[in-house]
């Protein structure tokens, strides 16, 4: 009689293993208040190009493969916010332009401010 040892793998372990394979390893450390430049893949017809989107990170959410950042910038006098999934294939590159010094986890108060009041102090130690 040969006893077979069958390894039981739960569904959650399979999902976690798959998600860990899909994570991008080369992402920089991003903090709320940082000014970042995100390279977004745009497909027009059969052409693909990378369009830069630069702004201030006003929120970070979730973790792992579902991690997102909300980036706000002013375009032609109007505030524009975009939410990026960091591990998405649509995000081609991510570069921190400058570090920001803030004391909040979410910077939603920047939505109500205009002009120079929307600036974030620069941090030099990170």
From Swiss-Prot:
Its domain of life reads Bacteria
- GO BP annotations listed: translation
What's a single GO CC term here? cytosolic large ribosomal subunit
Please provide an example of a Pfam family that matches this protein in its UniProt record. Ribosomal_L19
UniProt-listed Gene3D superfamilies? 2.30.30.790
Annotated InterPro entries: Ribosomal_bL19, Ribosomal_bL19_CS, Ribosomal_bL19_sf, Translation_prot_SH3-like_sf
The Swiss-Prot or TrEMBL record annotates one GO molecular function as: structural constituent of ribosome
Swiss-Prot/TrEMBL keywords = Ribonucleoprotein, Ribosomal protein
Q: Give the protein's biological function.
A: This protein is located at the 30S-50S ribosomal subunit interface and may play a role in the structure and function of the aminoacyl-tRNA binding site.
Instruction: Check the record and name the NCBIfam families matching this protein.
Output: rplS_bact (TIGR01024)
As for family, the record states: Belongs to the bacterial ribosomal protein bL19 family.
- Can you say what this protein is called? Large ribosomal subunit protein bL19
Organism the protein comes from: Prochlorococcus marinus (strain MIT 9312)
């Amino acid at each position: 009689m040969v006893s077979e040892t069958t390894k039981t793998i739960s569904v959650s372990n399979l999902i976690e293993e798959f998600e860990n394979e899909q994570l991008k390893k080369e992402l920089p450390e991003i903090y709320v208040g940082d000014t970042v430049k995100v390279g977004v893949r745009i497909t027009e017809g059969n052409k693909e190009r990378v369009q830069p989107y630069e702004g201030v990170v006003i929120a970070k959410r979730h973790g792992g493969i579902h991690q997102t950042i909300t980036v706000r910038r002013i375009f032609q006098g109007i505030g524009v916010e975009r939410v990026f999934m960091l591990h998405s294939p649509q995000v081609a590159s991510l570069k921190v332009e400058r570090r920001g010094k803030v004391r909040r986890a979410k910077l939603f108060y920047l939505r109500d401010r205009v002009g120079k009041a929307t600036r974030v102090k620069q941090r030099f130690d990170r």
